[in-house]
Design a protein with these regions (language model features):
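TPR alpha-solenoid repeat register
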Residues: 80, 113-114, 158, 201, ...
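Extracytoplasmic/luminal low-complexity segments enriched in Pro/Gly and acidic/polar residues
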Residues: 199-267
Length: 267
């Protein structure tokens, strides 16, 4: 499994700015329209549509390759399932691998297998140029990540993947509660509590701080990232952009020059 592809998938998806963070500010109590009820109804309709689409995919997925026989979908042979997943991984048939990984995870009630299934669903998102149902695949990833953490609550990697998945789901459909909106940040903070130097958690918390205009917190996060990984020019450019947003041109130029210097050195 290409873990760098998973990481890239999550990072690229996280860059997309969303209006979901302003949703609750716009949904005031005096509004004449019950936006929460409307969004809940819309989300339920989307969920039903997603389930139907996924069920249809499962019906046809067995014919997507001749290397793995279609009867594997009804097999309970864990050794055969594991081998099939490995073959599908090699062939970059990530959706099929995700389905079988989820099946294997349910048979074994194994948190690692549930996490593998989630990763395959995320990898499928950016594997091909063909249009994908991003919401469907992200929700399937979330479903498996929730199961991973139910069985292994201290899995920090799964917490980070879940935080980003929930963030992206909130980007695609309005969250139904304040708790759902805040959960990505809470999950990331749980990771930082036990691993204060976790690069991914610090990075995502920094980006969330920028989106919510908490620039001082964002600076704190990215300066720590610089101290942990001083050779990564991206962190310097992030700091440059934050200072620019704050109107501090001098600091912005300083961090930009540092980033440019690192880029030239690497080349």
């Amino acid at each position: 499994m290409n873990k760098s592809l998973i990481k890239a998938t999550l990072w690229v998806a996280f860059f997309v700015l969303t209006a979901s963070l302003t949703y609750f500010g716009l949904n005031r109590s005096e509004a004449s329209i019950d936006f929460k009820a409307l969004n809940k109804e819309k989300n339920q309709a989307q969920s039903a549509s997603i389930k139907e689409e996924f069920d249809n995919l499962i019906k046809n997925i067995g014919s997507s390759t001749t290397v793995v026989k279609p009867d594997i979908l009804s097999s309970t042979d864990t050794a055969r399932l594991s081998l099939s997943i490995q073959l599908l991984d090699t062939m970059k048939q990530y959706l099929y691998a995700a389905v079988l990984s989820e099946k294997l995870a349910n048979i074994q009630n194994n948190p690692t297998k549930f996490h593998d299934a989630a990763k395959y669903y995320l990898m499928e998102l950016y594997n091909h140029e063909a249009e994908k149902n991003e919401l469907m695949l992200t929700k399937k990833a979330r479903e498996n990540l929730e199961k991973t953490l139910a069985l292994k609550p201290k899995n920090n990697e799964a917490k980070i993947d879940l935080a980003v998945s929930i963030y992206n789901i909130n980007r695609m459909q309005a969250p139904e509660s304040q708790t759902e909106l805040m959960r990505p940040a809470l999950l990331l903070k749980e990771v930082i509590t036990v691993d204060s130097n976790n690069l991914d958690a610090l990075y995502y918390l920094g980006k969330l701080s920028i989106e919510t205009n908490q620039f001082e917190k964002a600076i704190e996060r990215f300066k720590k990232l610089v101290s942990l990984q001083p050779q990564n020019s991206d962190f310097y450019f992030e700091l440059s952009q934050i200072y620019a947003l704050m109107g501090n041109k001098e600091e912005s130029e300083l961090w930009n020059k540092k980033g440019q210097s690192l880029t030239k050195t690497i080349k």
